[in-house]
């Protein structure tokens, strides 16, 4: 086989023109109006967050008057079902813990146990002044916990005494925004810790008033103040003297 010296090899421009003519130019595909209305482009992470924020199942932990305001949401006037809130009685079926009211030292282990039994991811809303800082019940009380964030991590603080139902809705909306912006890859790296944002416990040592000696004393007042014993005896003698004079007359 002999090569024809007069036949030249095709140029690169001719090859490019032939390729474009046979294959067609590669461009951005056009999306029709019908196609754009039926297809949504998103990520698996956004889809997962969207499903969770629309189905928050709260576990209600009400210990005081703040819980009455949350109970008002169940009625038709506020209708909290539109946010996908389904109250649960078991912590294993809930992903939102709403703490409403004063938390005492005796109830603290039970609250921590309920939080630990909730599956991840889980969220906590501290509702009311008594839950956030201890409130008025912690002024001279040695049993009130001054802030629930000393026991469990809190995602959202809802101040008020008590907060109105509209404020509870605002807290739920803010929590939904937080859930929508979460990342699945970063959730395992970032762990919730105790932040201790509330005031510390400053207890005053008070001596015991009832020490068992009041059973041996004449009155409980003398048991608390032994220095009044002489005055009490003198007053008692005067009363007995007056009563004898009245009886003789």
Swiss-Prot record:
Keyword RNA-binding set for record: no
Record's cofactor remark: Binds 1 [4Fe-4S] cluster.
Function text: NDH-1 shuttles electrons from an unknown electron donor, via FMN and iron-sulfur (Fe-S) centers, to quinones in the respiratory and/or the photosynthetic chain. The immediate electron acceptor for the enzyme in this species is believed to be plastoquinone. Couples the redox reaction to proton translocation, and thus conserves the redox energy in a proton gradient. Cyanobacterial NDH-1 also plays a role in inorganic carbon-concentration.
GO cellular component terms listed in the entry, alphabetical order: plasma membrane-derived thylakoid membrane; respiratory chain complex I
Family: Belongs to the complex I 20 kDa subunit family.
Gene name of the record: ndhK
Membrane topology per record: Peripheral membrane protein
Record's protein name: NAD(P)H-quinone oxidoreductase subunit K
Localization per Swiss-Prot or TrEMBL: Cellular thylakoid membrane
Catalytic activity from the UniProt record: a plastoquinone + NADH + (n+1) H(+)(in) = a plastoquinol + NAD(+) + n H(+)(out); a plastoquinone + NADPH + (n+1) H(+)(in) = a plastoquinol + NADP(+) + n H(+)(out)
Main location: membrane
SUPFAM superfamilies: HydA/Nqo6-like (SSF56770)
Pfam family, one: Oxidored_q6
A molecular-function term among this protein's GO annotations: iron ion binding
UniProt subunit comment: NDH-1 can be composed of about 15 different subunits; different subcomplexes with different compositions have been identified which probably have different functions.
Cofactor: [4Fe-4S] cluster
Entry-linked InterPro entries: NADH_UbQ_OxRdtase-like_20kDa, NADH_UQ_OxRdtase_20Kd_su
């Amino acid at each position: 086989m002999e090569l024809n010296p007069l036949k030249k090899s095709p140029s690169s421009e001719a090859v490019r023109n032939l390729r474009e003519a046979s294959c067609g130019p590669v461009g951005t595909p056009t999306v029709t109006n019908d196609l754009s209305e039926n297809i949504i482009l998103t990520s698996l992470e956004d889809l997962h967050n969207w499903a969770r924020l629309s189905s928050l199942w709260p576990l209600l932990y009400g210990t005081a008057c703040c819980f009455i305001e949350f109970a008002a949401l169940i009625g038709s006037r506020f209708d909290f079902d539109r946010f996908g809130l389904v109250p649960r009685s078991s912590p294993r079926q809930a992903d939102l813990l709403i703490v409403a009211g004063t938390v005492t030292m005796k109830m603290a282990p039970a609250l921590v146990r309920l939080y630990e039994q909730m599956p991840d991811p889980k969220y906590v809303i501290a509702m009311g002044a008594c839950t956030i800082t201890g409130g008025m019940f912690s002024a001279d009380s040695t049993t009130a916990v001054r802030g629930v964030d000393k026991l469990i991590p809190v995602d959202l603080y809802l101040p008020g005494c008590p907060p109105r139902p509209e404020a509870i809705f605002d807290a739920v909306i803010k929590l939904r925004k937080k859930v929508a912006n979460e990342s699945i890859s970063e959730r395992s790296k970032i762990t919730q810790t105790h932040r201790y944002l509330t005031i510390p416990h400053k207890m005053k040592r008070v001596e015991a008033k009832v020490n068992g000696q009041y059973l041996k004393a004449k009155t409980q007042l003398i048991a608390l103040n032994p220095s009044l014993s002489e005055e009490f005896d003198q007053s008692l003698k005067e009363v007995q003297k007056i009563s004898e004079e009245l009886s003789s007359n």
